[in-house]
A protein has these predicted regions:
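N-terminal "cap/leader" segments of large eukaryotic alpha-helical scaffolds
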Residues: 2-59, 93, 354-356
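Short helix-loop boundary/capping segments at the starts of domains
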Residues: 37, 52-62, 69, 74-81, ...
Length: 357
């Protein structure tokens, strides 16, 4: 019986819009080319694949080396369709998590390239991903924050923060905060009215906005003249009210900002207002000493050490039945490294409260 050999059917070509991964060194160049495709379906599918690939450091390096960041910049700033812009912005956020890809973002001037989209794109998701990408970039090596400042973000963010949608206001403020470690960024934010913007947003109905505004205000008050400006704008009263905020993040931020502004003599004097406050600020500070949050108790100890310089405040702290026992409890913590740091600041606070002229 003759042997019958059946021909093996050829494998069908995959659809043009289906993204098939390459291997080794071809992975990055192939995907980068597909991300730049003119066909919308191919481009969107490639961007989706890129967002997944960026979680792998090796694949992220390959894509960055293939020049994908420049393509993403172009899509975010000039993409005609919303899915392309959203996915490209999301991919930039993934790039910012990787050291080599983040370096490529700085080299490609990403902050300047996407500024218009970051602040003004009609799609909220585009703005959200752009904020997240730049916050990560600004939180890394100094080159990242410097590139954001050089692109003019401090002034633009001060102007944008109050106008931004409430859901994105915390991101706008956090991005502004990331610029404040740069001397030029701090100066530009102050010149643009950053103090007034932060004080205004401390009154927001959203806890996340209040917390972000407090963090930003604390960063702005690194500058001595900014402390004076904040004090003159009634920052002490506003921040004292927030010490009893139901949100932990807002209490943390308010306490940190108060530590900054009460380093000045006028800030200390404002702790004793001419007219009594609706709620006693010193009592609120003492209550923070008993919080279970180590960051908050450490900051509260710093605040006690600052304000205890004022004789009236020092007397009130000393006479309060809960103040010194709360400080002693922090000094005698369980003994972890974190507790040791809290105890160190608690000892300083206790010395300030018990100081006699």
């Amino acid at each position: 019986m003759p042997l019958i050999v059946k021909p093996t059917p050829a494998h069908p070509e995959p659809p043009a819009h289906k993204i098939m991964p390459a291997f080794a060194t071809r992975f990055g160049p192939k995907l980068a080319g597909e991300v730049a495709a003119t066909d919308r379906l191919v481009r969107v599918n490639a961007l989706t694949a890129l967002c997944d690939a960026l979680s792998d450091p090796e694949q992220a390096h390959g894509c960055a080396d293939a020049g994908v960041v420049e393509t993403l910049n172009a899509h975010v700033s000039g993409g005609q369709d919303a899915p392309t812009r959203v996915l490209a912005a999301k991919a930039l956020c993934g790039c910012a998590r990787d050291a080599r890809a983040a370096r490529a973002m700085v080299d490609a001037a990403t902050p300047a390239a996407i500024q218009g989209a970051c602040l003004n794109d009609a799609e909220q998701d585009v703005r959200m991903h752009c904020y997240d990408a730049l916050i990560r970039l600004g939180g890394g090596p100094r080159r990242g924050a410097s590139s954001i400042v050089a692109a003019g973000y401090p002034k633009a963010l001060v102007e944008k923060a109050e106008k931004e949608s409430v859901g994105l206001q915390p991101r706008a403020l956090d991005l502004l905060t990331s610029c404040l470690g740069n001397e030029q960024g701090l100066a530009e934010a102050l010149d643009a009215g950053g103090i007034a913007t932060c004080l205004s947003l401390l009154g927001s109905m959203e806890a996340a906005v209040r917390a972000a505004a407090g963090r930003c205000l604390a960063g702005l008050c690194f500058d001595v003249s900014a402390k004076d400006a904040a004090v003159e704008a009634d920052a002490v009263d506003i921040l004292c009210a927030l010490l009893e905020d139901p949100d932990l993040g807002a209490r943390r931020a308010a306490c940190a900002a108060l530590v900054s502004v009460t380093t000045t003599d006028e800030g200390k004097r404002r702790m004793v207002p001419a007219e009594p406050r609706p709620r006693d600020a010193v009592a609120a500070i003492i209550a923070l000493l008993a919080e279970p949050d180590a960051y908050l108790t450490t900051t509260a100890c710093k605040l006690v050490a600052n304000v205890a310089v004022h004789p009236k405040v020092r007397a009130q702290l000393r006479e309060d039945k809960e103040c010194l026992p709360a400080i002693d409890a922090l000094i005698a913590g369980p003994g972890t490294d974190q507790d040791a740091l809290v105890a160190q600041h608690a000892r300083i606070a206790k010395d300030a409260v018990l100081w006699e002229p």
